């Protein structure tokens, strides 16, 4: 059996175990996928300064995110259809995150419901909200997150209009999924995945089915979902949601300094510099290239985090050195989930933590809290 050494090894294992339509859903970008690729490539272009003869015998990777102590500044990002990478996927990922000491974020478009995750997780989690046309549903959803004791509300703003993802079109993947004959054949070639799905009752969007009038089956769910993208979404709408939620608010999907300042003005506690993993506007900036200008624009008024392209602990360190106060991972933990369930997510976190710790040591920096652009080669730090 091949040993797992890095996130790429988990990706290869997940690709073998997860049905093609669901694997492709997680592992693809929009249109030509140029932004999807740039997220990774631009991180890899950032080079470190190797330092020697510095005492790094004791190293500390802990940093707070919204006042919550974390083993490392890495949160599990909200990802739709997580429960289709592995049966009960959201529950398993939340458990792994809680045990490891990092935050977990549940997506509106999750398979397991808010209540499911709350009942099985040993720690509070964050809830991610899509602002859809049905504002009554939004209000009820926010109330449910409050009742589940979610410690923060993450509002995603970059999905007013769905970007086109060619692989999803070819696979017949919609919301909910409509498998093609080819994909049905592929499903039966994944026996472990199928057995897992047969063993759970959670196979639909748990936050929606049973919570929206008239949505009782796959057909009515599909009709409702298609009708709910809200191209008219404005900062006034976000302000109203902010008033409803008394806890911490995170605004996700920021790539422009002007939008970052607007998020500060509505009372955000943190913002996530993100291009939705390269799944929305192809040709947009990579997250890491957008990060410095946004950090400069908001200063210390709000925590600035980043997601997109993070596949290693080295990438986490690059983001922190470029000014981020935290990071989120999506695909990296989904690969672990698809490869091995809860244990696979834990393995992904262990890999990233080990890489982060070792790279700090090789850069002569024992404390992550003190990391800045001085650990990068001059050409990279000039961008800060």
Please state what every model-predicted region is.
Residues 70-109:
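Glycine-rich active-site/cofactor-binding loop and its immediate structural neighborhood
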Residues 75-81, 124-130, 222-224:
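Short, basic, glycine/proline-bearing loop/turn elements
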Residues 1-68, 176-233, 369-373, 377-384:
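An N-cap/entry alpha-helix motif that binds or orients negatively charged groups
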Residues 30-31, 108-112, 133, 255, ...:
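Short beta->alpha linker loops
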């Amino acid at each position: 059996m091949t040993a797992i050494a890095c996130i790429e090894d988990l990706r290869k294992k997940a690709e073998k175990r997860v049905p093609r339509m669901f694997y492709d859903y997680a592992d693809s970008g929009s249109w030509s996928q140029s932004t999807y690729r740039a997220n990774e490539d631009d991180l890899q272009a950032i080079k470190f300064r190797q330092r020697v003869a510095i005492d790094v015998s004791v190293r500390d990777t802990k940093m707070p995110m919204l006042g919550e102590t974390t083993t490392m500044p890495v949160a599990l990002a909200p990802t739709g259809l997580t429960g289709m990478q592995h049966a009960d996927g959201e529950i398993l990922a939340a458990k792994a995150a809680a045990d490891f000491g990092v935050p977990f974020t549940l997506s509106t478009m999750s398979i397991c419901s808010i209540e499911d995750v709350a009942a099985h997780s040993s720690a509070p989690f964050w809830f991610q909200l899509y602002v859809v046309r049905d504002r009554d549903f939004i209000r009820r959803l926010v109330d449910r997150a409050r009742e589940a004791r979610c410690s923060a509300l993450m509002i995603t703003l970059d999905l007013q209009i769905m970007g086109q993802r060619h692989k999803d079109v070819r696979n017949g993947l919609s919301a909910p999924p409509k498998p093609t004959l080819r994909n049905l054949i592929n499903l039966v070639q994944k026996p472990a995945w199928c057995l897992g799905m047969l063993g759970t009752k959670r196979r639909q969007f748990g936050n929606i089915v049973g919570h929206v009038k008239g949505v009782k089956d796959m057909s009515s769910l599909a009709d409702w979902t298609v009708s709910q993208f809200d191209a008219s979404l404005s900062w006034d709408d976000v302000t109203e949601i902010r008033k409803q939620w008394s806890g911490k608010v995170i605004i996700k999907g920021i790539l422009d300094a002007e939008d970052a300042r607007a998020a500060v003005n509505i009372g955000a506690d943190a913002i996530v510099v993100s291009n939705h993993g390269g799944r929305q506007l192809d040709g947009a900036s990579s997250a890491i290239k957008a990060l410095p200008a946004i950090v400069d624009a908001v200063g210390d008024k709000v925590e600035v985090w980043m997601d997109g392209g993070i596949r290693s602990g080295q990438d986490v360190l690059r983001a922190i050195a470029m000014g981020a106060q935290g990071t989120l991972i999506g695909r990296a933990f989904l690969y672990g989930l698809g490869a091995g369930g809860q244990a696979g997510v834990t393995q992904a976190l262990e890999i990233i933590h080990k890489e982060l710790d070792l790279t700090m040591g090789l850069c002569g920096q024992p404390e992550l809290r003190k990391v800045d652009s001085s650990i990068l080669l001059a050409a990279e730090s000039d961008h800060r």
